[in-house]
């Protein structure tokens, strides 16, 4: 039976040791970040010299190196990012994993043959998104961690030529990647900029905002670690071409252990003998690091069991219970034996409120073993209560085995050396001439003394090869020597041969430096040209252009209820964006249509806001609303392109992550009639984004609570341990207004949307009134207010912003009417706080 083709196994590395660990244990490719522009800004990075070594180590073993360039790039950073990528390409990387759409386009212009992969931060989770990736010309995309096997099969069938990659192991972001703004909101450490503060790993209280009642408490949005070993066969059959292990910040021992485990599982897939792994087979993968394991969402939502709940960090493996304490020894019953130097934790029974304890095991005695249960006595420094759970946080033997697996790998890897070719010519009485070439470089050197008749050893190929081959620590290695042009029976002192070699190397190095400087200058000019020429063919929105012609500052109010839409219209909004998907239940289509007609009579446009996440199963509900034929606002880049191609008026929302003008140009090229830049940009950065269009076609969010996270998981469902998506009475009747309260007392509203996803909103509304003059001065003419929480003062805030915009348009100031409404319960957002 022929072997089945299996996906590439992609391992993480944050250090050279981790690169060695990965390739030694069977990784087909390794992804790592260099010191700039990647999504791990706190230590999991290689220097450029280390990156070159990583490429050498990997390539010697037949593995590839992928560079993570997976953050959003600010306007001023684009030239630096492209130049830095060039330096990394020079070091030998095979591909780059990129998030920023504008950067992808620039890479294709500057490095047209280079391989580009789309990061999971691009939030590709359906056919429409995958089609845009194919249109962009990328080679592969990393799918959202939330995709099911059914989703993947549908994407594979619809876009057969796009490479697909998916995560199989490691830490899980609770939010859809690319859609987490919560860290940046709280601490200015943006997940989209590589500085995530891990807001999801904090403990929270879930409260009913109406009654104040506590509904749940703990690490409520801290996901367990992914371990998709049971699904490997099905993932491969679904058409995934690459399986990715998360963990660039993990230790080399983790990389070695997990890579080896999945390499062995994939060998079974290849042979056609795969069966779900046993406890013994997966135990090392869980033991090396685990917050608890989940199979992820390949089979659908898991509900309460998806979350760690009790602790956010490495827990290890639960082995058994404490049965006694005698003469300084803890007595335990465990289902796997404990050894000396193992790290142990002891936890109170479920529901207990005492703190856990732990220590490294001292002397261990096995008292008995029967039916897979070991009774052991462990020397301890203090008593541990009977009935407490025994957890092994680290296993000494496993760590030693992992270290041994890569101890000798890549230690001799040397810097890449360029092959030299030497052609020698000479006759009696004339100097020896050597033409030395290295790639496109060529030098000619001559001896300072003439060739003479040999009285002892004559000059021959072996001697020439020996002397010209002594290249030591130079960046060259002798590959070929041709001495056919040297007459026989001649002599030249060895010191003269050495001088010629040294002179050739010195001249080659000078030429190489000149060539490198010239290449860098050429590359720099190419980069400058590419960055300066922003998609000249990109169209601007005709409706927005018309607005600009009147010089009116247009006010857009985004709401989720019909009554709020009508309040905004009455208070002076020029356009209303309705998000009927934000919360259960939907408004009726007939009621929305009637409101739309009333708005039209008042000269107000009604625009439909789509969800950013539209899984295949959700599409039927969305299509019902799209049938209304309204203009659309969408943060789903795939939908922007699909609807624009069908002739719809579509504005790209902030979830499209427009961080620079080149991304804006690509969104316009996809058909967007307008673009809302990221809510993580400062006023000055927004000005840079909109400058090529003079502000025309752009809309800025100036008030309200942006969505901080989009979760496939539902915290309310988990609190009551209901079957996922079968509990709408909780969010529609029992607890329609809930908040997550963090340890500092900040409350984050939770909106449970049409597909039972949670959208976590910022704890306080942004107020950008003081920045209106500068934004208007940049040419921006559309300003959006977000009203997405019960109790929002829609009419008052809309009226205050109408007054502020009219004041700015008249050359005055925006006034303080909005601040008077808010008091001190607001934030200036990122208008003056860079991420």
Which stretches of residues belong to each language-model region?
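Conserved phosphotransfer cores of two-component systems
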Residues: 111
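Glycine-rich, highly charged phosphate/nucleotide-binding loops
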Residues: 46-52
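Surface-exposed amphipathic alpha-helical tracts and adjacent flexible/coil segments at the periphery
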Residues: 1-24, 29-40, 55, 61-71, ...
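Active-site glycine-rich loop that binds ribose-phosphate moieties when present
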Residues: 124-126, 227-228
